[in-house]
Structures are given as C-alpha cells and as structure tokens.
C-alpha cells in the first residue's frame, strides 16, 4: 500500500440537549450533528518498524498530548487486530479545544480507513466499543453523514444535506469540557423527535445548546461573540458547538457569510476565524 490521504472533517453540534445525569454521573445528552468542509489531512503509509509513528504538523499541532490516533493504534495492537505498523502524519487545521471534535474525528477517520481497506476486520459491536474506549465522539468520525445522537449514545444517520454556509470564530481560550458540564444544572425536558425535517432551517433555528449558559458564565467572551454574530445581516442563527470555544454563525448564502467573516476579523483581530460550508 502506498501513502494515502484521509480527510478528517470537523463536526458541529447544531443542537445539544442535556436530559439529566446517568447513574455513572455522566450526562445524558441528545444532539444534532453535522460536518463542515474544514478538515485535517491525515497521511498514512505502512512501515517496516517495531512501532507505529504518529506525528503532527500545521497551525494547531503544538502541545498535543495523549492523541486519539495513538490511543486507537494501542487498542488495535493490544487486541491483535492489526498486523502491520504505520506511519501517520496529521496536518492539523482544526483548532484544539474548539468543540469541533478534531481529535475524535481523526481517530474515527483512521479506523474507518482501516476497515474499508480490510486492514482491520471487526464487527459493528467491536467498532462501537473501540470508539467509546477512545472518546465519546469518535464514532461520529467513522463517516460524515448528518447524525442525531440519542440517549445511551445511540446514533441515527441521515443522508439529508443542509447546505448552509458557516462562519466559525474561536477566541484564544480553550473551554474546559469538564468544568462546563459540572456547572450544567438546567436540563432539557423536550426530547428530539427523529425526522428528516429536523435538519430544515426553521427547525434548527428553534434548537439550542444547553452548554452555552455555563460556558458563557465561565468565559464571557463567548457571549460577546454570539451577540456580535447575531446582529450581522442575513444570519439565520448563531450557536456554540459542543462545549466550545467555537461560535458558529449560519447563513443560507455565501455573500452575507463572507461579509460576516470580514466584520468578525475586523472586530476580533487576534481570534481564529474561517468561512466554511456544511457537507
């Protein structure tokens, strides 16, 4: 096998509802998830070595510890599910601690590649178990179909296309997921009803992210960013993705999204920002 390129796309939470706590003290969540064209590039090739090699480069490659791909390889080796060793180079274009799931999507993308190329042969149950062992969002990285995460981590996939332009802006801070969940006291009563209509713009506009309030209390700049983007012309809705710290503004057309990006960069010069589109 020659060197291959895998594109690992960023995920966005169009909604995130906290329903309560499980007996294990983890939160019960439901979420509508989509993907944008922003992606990490993963180069992978077999090597004749004793150990795998995992390296990072790019604008967001510094200070990566306990990366998800190394965890995946360690699990596959331990279970004797992979015979060869691989060199994997990741071009990191997705910021860390951004709510965009960069690391989780990386592991899911690599596992999906191994399975499709018959490097790893495992059952659906084994896929779920391995993904959950690495992280709660890794299963979402296995493919990039729009998804609804239901209680007990059940995931429903849809072929529906959303077709929205997005402006993503992230301050220099990275949110502490643990602290934000710990401060989440208000739980949603209404559960998501599975329907293709749930991905329509009017339905998405009325959705919410229950983690916004505790995140905004911890990091007031996030509230400021959302307020700013909510006032730009032709924006349909603005929402934090995941536990932050990226705020996402959604548009039907490219031109107002471009204008919003210009305004955001003018007013928040030192923040990371980008224009993208849902897949």
What are these regions (language model features)?
Residues 33-36, 76, 131, 229, ...:
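Hydrophobic C-terminal alpha-helix "anchor/cap" residues
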């Amino acid at each position: 096998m020659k060197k291959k390129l895998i594109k690992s796309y960023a995920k966005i939470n169009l909604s995130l509802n906290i329903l309560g706590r499980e007996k294990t003290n983890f939160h019960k969540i439901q979420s509508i998830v989509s993907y944008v064209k922003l992606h990490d590039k993963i180069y992978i090739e077999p090597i004749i070595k004793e150990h795998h090699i995992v390296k990072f480069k790019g604008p967001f490659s510094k200070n990566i510890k306990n990366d998800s791909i190394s965890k995946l390889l360690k699990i596959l080796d331990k279970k004797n599910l992979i015979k060869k060793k691989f060199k994997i180079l990741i071009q990191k274009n997705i910021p860390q601690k951004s709510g965009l799931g960069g690391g989780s999507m990386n592991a899911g993308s690599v596992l999906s590649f191994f399975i499709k190329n018959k490097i790893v042969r495992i059952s659906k149950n084994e896929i779920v178990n391995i993904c959950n062992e690495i992280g709660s969002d890794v299963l979402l990285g296995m493919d990039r179909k729009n998804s609804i995460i239901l209680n007990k981590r059940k995931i429903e996939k849809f072929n529906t296309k959303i077709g929205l332009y997005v402006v993503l802006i992230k301050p220099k801070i990275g949110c502490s997921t643990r602290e934000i969940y710990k401060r989440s006291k208000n739980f949603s009563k209404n559960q998501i009803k599975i329907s293709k209509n749930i991905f329509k713009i009017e339905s998405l506009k009325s959705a919410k992210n229950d983690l916004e309030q505790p995140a905004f209390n911890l990091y007031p700049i996030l509230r400021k960013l959302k307020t700013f983007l909510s006032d730009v012309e032709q924006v349909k809705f603005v929402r934090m993705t995941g536990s932050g710290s990226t705020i996402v503004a959604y548009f039907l057309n490219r031109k107002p999204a471009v204008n919003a990006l210009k305004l955001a960069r003018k007013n928040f010069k030192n923040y990371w920002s980008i224009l993208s589109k849902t897949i």
